[in-house]
């Protein structure tokens, strides 16, 4: 019998086809866990959501929101950018292969991904909004999950999934390699003897009914169904910044991290907690059909509290009555699409996309200006834009080569070019928002770090010949995880492990394969809510140290304009930018202090470097979980005195700058600093 899989809300892909010997081709012993009880049950699920408010619920949570698991339980849904793992339970020697592109061209596809409408009162799907298209909206790829080799699969969304929404998927079992699990079959076919069983039976009936209405596929062909909601990290960021604004407005002298986190945890929940139900205020629309910007009044509160510090006047210099659009950004995923020529599309974002703006600014530079940049392609900011703006057919060709070529080409394409694919302009994304002028002469070259950190350093190093007046823009790629390039990047690197061990003297702060939580910032800082609380603390720590002539003089005349956008999954990776030097020769155009830029070193050093921030040590100390291990707390306590001395640099890089990086030009630059994290939606 042909069988299908449905996932509602973000989805997971079902797997068509078996591997192994000829004797195993007809095997039907493989199945999917449903009740989230086994190691194979790794996908988001409606079963992990509270019935009364839709927030996530984890069995190990407590009432203390400084507990990371408990803080994560305040989330309204799963990331809009993450790939969904599907790990079948298989017998030894049996593999379940991903469906092929050809199978998706059949009249009945092996997998369906659907976006569903969500009833915020009943907290469950109420209909199907859209059946998403394979190769356009999502792809199915092999996963490196530690299961039977070749069995694990992942559904990789190409644009971000819709925020504050639900999704579903369905797959067809063309070779009968997957069957319904016994738990799913029991709940589906039996009404149940208690309230829990009856509720699950009703959910399965609802999910399969909606799928049949949208596709015409009968429920007896469905072997699995589930749904879950999504939440954008950008929505949460707006809420957290709003909390910071309210705290600082009430007490403009100091920003107490503990007070901020308490306010955020109890009074500034994201998404529907900000606006119960579906009746949200009318907000500024995103261009190109993107979702409306949430919490407009929160943005106003932020602007009122922080003035030009958060809103760079050069970036957003418009009358208050004129809407400032938020543009779209295509994230750079870890894996390229598994379909030749498939390219990610702009994803819904709720914060302005710096790459898009800089790209469009560079597009406005004339050919003579490009020649004036010197050195030809890649030698200056305009050449930098040229290097990023490859024709679609060439980029598609590289994408095919990256997916289907040999291992060396895959590594080269994924590591060296993936970040360039993301820099595609979105329609009506605020062209000219950043213009070449005395302060930003030729646009803003970008420094990347993240999953392609080492390759980005190598590639950008060839294009970093900046002239005075060019302002580097530090961008963090969405969903970076480090260690993706031969296991060398991120906090999982050996250099990072050594740095953290020296820092705290405890292995509890070191990320290993057995202990990934330090990398996720979940073991030592109260930043579980999408790591956003720490990003706000980092932002203001940077503002304090950069706000000349008087530290902490936020928004005062002559203070440095710092525009912080987003967050970084790793600890304090965003502000890898600079030391600072006072410069009292303020121009009429508003150029702030002179800034000396340091080439971003190895990503793993940024977390340790943040601890050297004067005035930031207490914040780190406060962030140590009260429930953390004794040696972890002792390690930070011993290191705390190192955080109180006034350093010459905002962040002192532990990795020396490599030769040939053109620092002499950037050292003479007089421009504002923009500290940027991921500008897409999701968990980073």
Curated annotation (Swiss-Prot):
<feature type="compositionally biased region" description="Basic and acidic residues">
    <location>
        <begin position="385"/>
        <end position="405"/>
    </location>
</feature>
<feature type="region of interest" description="Disordered">
    <location>
        <begin position="321"/>
        <end position="405"/>
    </location>
</feature>
<keyword id="KW-0443">Lipid metabolism</keyword>
<keyword id="KW-0378">Hydrolase</keyword>
<dbReference type="InterPro" id="IPR025920">
    <property type="entry name" value="Lipase_bact_N"/>
</dbReference>
<keyword id="KW-0964">Secreted</keyword>
<feature type="region of interest" description="Disordered">
    <location>
        <begin position="462"/>
        <end position="493"/>
    </location>
</feature>
<dbReference type="GO" id="GO:0005576">
    <property type="term" value="C:extracellular region"/>
</dbReference>
<comment type="subunit">
    <text>Monomer.</text>
</comment>
<dbReference type="GO" id="GO:0004806">
    <property type="term" value="F:triacylglycerol lipase activity"/>
</dbReference>
<keyword id="KW-0732">Signal</keyword>
<feature type="signal peptide">
    <location>
        <begin position="1"/>
        <end position="48"/>
    </location>
</feature>
<dbReference type="GO" id="GO:0016042">
    <property type="term" value="P:lipid catabolic process"/>
</dbReference>
<feature type="active site" description="Nucleophile">
    <location>
        <position position="568"/>
    </location>
</feature>
<protein>
    <recommendedName>
        <fullName>Extracellular lipase</fullName>
        <ecNumber>3.1.1.3</ecNumber>
    </recommendedName>
</protein>
<keyword id="KW-0442">Lipid degradation</keyword>
<dbReference type="Pfam" id="PF12262">
    <property type="entry name" value="Lipase_bact_N"/>
</dbReference>
<comment type="similarity">
    <text>Belongs to the AB hydrolase superfamily. Lipase family.</text>
</comment>
<comment type="function">
    <text>The optimum chain lengths for the acyl moiety is C6 for ester hydrolysis and C6 and C8 for triacylglycerol hydrolysis.</text>
</comment>
């Amino acid at each position: 019998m042909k069988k299908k899989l449905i996932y509602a809300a973000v989805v997971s892909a079902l797997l068509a086809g078996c591997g192994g010997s000829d004797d195993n081709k007809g095997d039907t012993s493989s199945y999917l866990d449903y009740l989230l009880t086994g190691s194979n049950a790794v996908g988001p699920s409606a079963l992990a959501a509270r019935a009364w408010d839709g927030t996530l619920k984890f069995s190990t949570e407590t009432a203390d929101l400084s507990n990371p698991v408990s803080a994560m339980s305040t989330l309204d849904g799963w990331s809009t950018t993450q790939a969904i793992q599907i790990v079948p339970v298989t017998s030894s020697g049996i593999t379940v292969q991903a469906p092929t592109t050809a199978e998706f061209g059949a009249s009945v596809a092996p997998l369906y991904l659907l976006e569903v409408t969500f009833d915020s009162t009943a907290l469950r799907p109420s209909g199907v909004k859209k059946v998403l298209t394979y190769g356009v909206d999502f792809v199915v790829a092999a996963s490196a999950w530690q299961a039977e080799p070749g069995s694990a699969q992942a559904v990789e969304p190409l644009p971000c999934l819709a925020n504050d929404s639900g999704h579903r998927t369905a797959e067809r079992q063309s070779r009968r390699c997957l069957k319904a699990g016994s738990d799913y079959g029991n709940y589906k076919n039996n009404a149940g003897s208690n309230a829990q069983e009856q509720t699950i039976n009703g959910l399965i009936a609802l999910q399969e009914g909606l799928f049949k209405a949208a596709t015409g596929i009968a429920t007896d062909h469905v072997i699995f169904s589930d749904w879950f909601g999504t939440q954008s990290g950008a929505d949460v960021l707006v809420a957290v910044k709003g909390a910071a604004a309210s705290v600082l407005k009430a007490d403009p002298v100091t920003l107490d991290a503990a007070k901020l986190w308490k306010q955020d945890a109890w009074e500034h929940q994201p998404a529907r907690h900000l606006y119960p139900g579906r009746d949200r205020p009318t907000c500024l629309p995103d261009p190109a059909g993107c979702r409306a910007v949430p919490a407009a009044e929160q943005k106003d509160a932020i602007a009122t509290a922080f003035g030009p510090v958060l809103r760079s006047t050069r970036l957003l210099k418009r009358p208050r009555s004129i809407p400032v659009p938020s543009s779209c950004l295509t994230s750079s995923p870890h894996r390229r699409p598994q379909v030749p020529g498939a390219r990610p599309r702009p994803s819904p974002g709720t914060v302005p996309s710096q790459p898009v703006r800089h790209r469009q600014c560079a597009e406005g530079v004339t050919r003579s200006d490009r020649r004036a940049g010197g050195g030809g392609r890649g030698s200056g900011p305009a050449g930098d834009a040229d290097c990023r703006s490859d024709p679609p057919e060439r980029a598609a060709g590289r994408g095919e080569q990256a997916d289907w070529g040999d291992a060396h080409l895959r590594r080269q394409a994924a590591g060296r070019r993936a970040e360039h694919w993301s820099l595609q302009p979105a329609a009506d994304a605020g062209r000219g928002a950043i213009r070449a002028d005395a302060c930003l002469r030729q646009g803003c070259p970008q420094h990347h770090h993240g999953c392609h950190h080492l390759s980005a350093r190598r590639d950008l190093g060839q294009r970093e010949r900046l002239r005075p007046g060019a302002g580097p823009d530090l961008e963090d790629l969405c969903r970076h995880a480090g260690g993706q390039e031969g296991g060398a990047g991120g906090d999982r690197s050996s250099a990072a492990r050594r740095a953290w061990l020296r820092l705290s003297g405890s292995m509890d702060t070191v990320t290993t394969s057995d202990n990934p939580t330090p990398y996720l910032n979940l073991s030592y800082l109260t930043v579980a809510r999408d790591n956003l609380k720490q990003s706000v603390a980092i932002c203001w720590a940077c503002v304090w140290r950069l706000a000349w002539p008087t530290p902490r003089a936020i928004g005062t005349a002559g203070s440095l304009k710092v525009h912080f956008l987003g967050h970084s999954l790793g600890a304090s990776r965003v502000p890898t930018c600079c030391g600072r030097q006072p410069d009292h020769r303020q121009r009429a155009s508003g150029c702030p202090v002179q800034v000396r830029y340091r080439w971003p070193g190895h990503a793993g050093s940024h977390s340790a470097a943040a601890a050297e921030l004067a005035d930031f040590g207490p914040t780190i100390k406060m962030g140590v979980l009260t429930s953390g291990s004794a040696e972890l707390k002792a390690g930070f306590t011993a290191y705390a005195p190192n955080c109180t001395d006034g350093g010459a640099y905002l962040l002192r890089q532990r990795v020396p700058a490599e030769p040939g990086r053109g620092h002499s030009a950037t050292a003479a630059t007089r421009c504002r600093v923009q500290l940027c994290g991921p500008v897409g939606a999701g968990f980073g």
